[in-house]
């Protein structure tokens, strides 16, 4: 009987510890935007994210990637203040750069807002498509 009680309690404690870890470090992990088929992989605490296929850039705070195209927008620096991070972002060619904020919202979504600099673009059907200045991202499980 004790075995049957111990297992559910252990599972509950494990889930609780995982939930607390994501709340303590909300700017670590992967978030996505299904409408534009883009995602952000980040660890703004340890700055130890490597861009797949572009390891020459070394470890970074994170990047925004595209599910359709291999181009990336690299986070070159990040400063966290409460539930908002200020990001310096450049494309993987280094030809365009911008400053943006990434905010954790109360509903556990994230808002990326381009503050100044170049417009973020993605490639669609052999043409550049500008992304909106404000994008909402959802945590990926």
Give the residues covered by each predicted segment.
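Central antiparallel beta-sheet cores of small beta-barrel/beta-sandwich binding domains
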Residues: 21-99, 105, 110, 115, ...
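Bacterial Sec-dependent N-terminal signal peptides
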Residues: 1-24
């Amino acid at each position: 009987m004790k075995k049957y009680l111990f297992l559910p309690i252990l599972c509950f404690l494990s889930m609780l510890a995982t939930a607390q870890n994501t709340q303590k470090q909300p700017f670590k992990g992967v978030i996505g935007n299904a409408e534009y088929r883009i995602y952000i992989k980040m660890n703004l605490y340890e700055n130890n994210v490597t861009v797949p296929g572009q390891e020459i850039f070394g470890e970074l705070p994170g990047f925004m990637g595209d599910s359709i195209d291999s181009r990336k927008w690299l986070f070159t620096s990040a400063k966290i203040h409460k539930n908002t991070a200020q990001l310096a972002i450049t494309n993987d060619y280094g030809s365009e750069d911008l400053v943006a904020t990434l905010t954790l919202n109360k509903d556990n979504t994230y808002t990326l807002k381009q503050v100044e600099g170049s417009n973020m673009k993605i490639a669609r059907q052999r043409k550049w498509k500008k992304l909106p200045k404000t994008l909402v991202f959802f945590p990926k499980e």
